[in-house]
Design a protein with these regions (language model features):
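Glycine-/small-residue-enriched transmembrane alpha-helix faces in small-molecule transporters
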Residues: 1-41, 85, 149-176, 196-198
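Cytoplasmic-side transmembrane-helix entry/capping segments in multi-pass membrane proteins
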Residues: 13-14, 66-76, 122-134, 157, ...
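Membrane-interface helix-cap regions at the ends of transmembrane helices
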Residues: 18, 22-29, 33, 47-65, ...
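Specific transmembrane alpha-helical segments of multi-pass solute transporters/efflux pumps
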Residues: 19-24, 52-103, 139, 226-244
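Structural signature of hydrophobic alpha-helical transmembrane segments
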Residues: 32-49, 88-107, 153-165, 215-230
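Helix-helix packing/entry segments at the starts of transmembrane helices
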Residues: 40-42, 80, 84, 98-105, ...
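Transmembrane alpha-helical segments that form core, pore/gating elements
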Residues: 51, 110-112, 116, 130, ...
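Hydrophobic transmembrane alpha-helices of multi-pass small-molecule transport proteins
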Residues: 51, 73, 105, 122-144, ...
């Protein structure tokens, strides 16, 4: 691969990592004018028109088989209904920095859940990594419970972790179907499943009063979540993986919590504590 192509590859990957890393900050900005449940629901709904456009242009179809349809539904419900709703709800009650650190624990959850589903017993280095990552997550909860940090609650952190777990369930279901029909097809159809599921929530739970109370910055943050985190970052990241391979590109994901914590400091003025930094480092070491 030429130096020019390599630079282009890393640029695409880093843009995706930046958008993913900024997701907790976008979410925190959105929850300033709407509750977390509404923000999580709107994230999929505003992404739906773009997802539908991509499906129509690319002619992405899901096979009308029972197993394929079930996996798409699980992918959509886990990754694009339950994950954003619980995650956004959690961010409403904690800091973006804590949420950013919590996203790193998703890789640990994915490893454990995959091992359980596949009924395999990994070696001791894997268990050491899992234990280390779990220790980092417990450090985050410990800070929320035991140290007075403005904006941090253990309930918010717990909701973030619950959202990450639901997202991992959706990710694993989608990954199994990806081998058959491709990742873009799975993701775009999952967005439509999620939007159809969440639309009644917006109508009957949020209502017109909540939607009209969202200001311009709030809608900008929600659009960034829907179009950026859900669609654009996904397409860029998978393009980088396809061209460069997991071995060369995958490690860049470790920058996501770093980006999130840095943006929380710069854009939101959040206090970055020593326990938060230590917990993030410990989780990354475990990953």
């Amino acid at each position: 691969m030429s130096q020019t192509n390599l630079s282009r590859l890393y640029t695409i990957a880093l843009i995706a990592v930046f958008i993913y890393g900024a997701t907790p900050v976008f979410t925190k900005m959105a929850t300033a004018t709407a509750d977390g449940i509404t923000v999580g629901a709107l994230r999929a709904i505003v992404a739906a028109p773009l997802a539908l456009f991509i499906i129509l242009v690319g002619r992405y179809r899901v096979p009308l088989r029972r197993d394929a349809i079930i996996l798409v539904v699980i992918s959509g419900m886990g990754g694009l209904v339950l994950f954003p709703v619980f995650f956004s709800w959690g961010v409403q009650h904690t800091t973006a920095g804590h949420a950013a650190a919590g996203t790193a624990f998703g890789a640990v959850m994915a490893g454990v859940l995959s091992a359980l589903i596949d009924r395999r017993m990994p070696g001791w280095p894997w268990w050491i990594g899992i234990a280390t990552g779990t220790l980092g997550a417990l450090l985050l909860i410990w800070e929320a419970v035991g140290i007075e940090v403005e904006g941090v609650t253990w309930q918010g952190d717990a909701l973030v972790f619950l959202g990450m777990f639901m997202g991992v369930v959706g990710y694993i279901a989608g990954a199994r179907l990806t081998k058959q029909i491709g990742s873009t097809t799975v993701t775009m159809w999952s967005v439509l499943v999620a939007a159809a599921t969440l639309l009644p929530l917006i109508i009957f739970y949020s209502g017109a009063e909540t939607l009209t109370a969202i200001d311009r910055d709030g809608w900008g943050a929600i659009l960034a979540l829907g179009w950026g985190s859900t669609i654009l970052a996904y397409l860029l990241w998978n393009r980088a993986l396809a061209d460069g391979g997991v071995g060369k590109i995958g490690a860049l994901q470790l920058l996501q919590p770093v980006v999130g914590i840095a943006l929380a400091l710069m854009l939101l003025g959040e206090r970055i504590t020593l326990p938060l930094l230590i917990a993030t480092l410990v989780i990354l070491v475990g990953v």
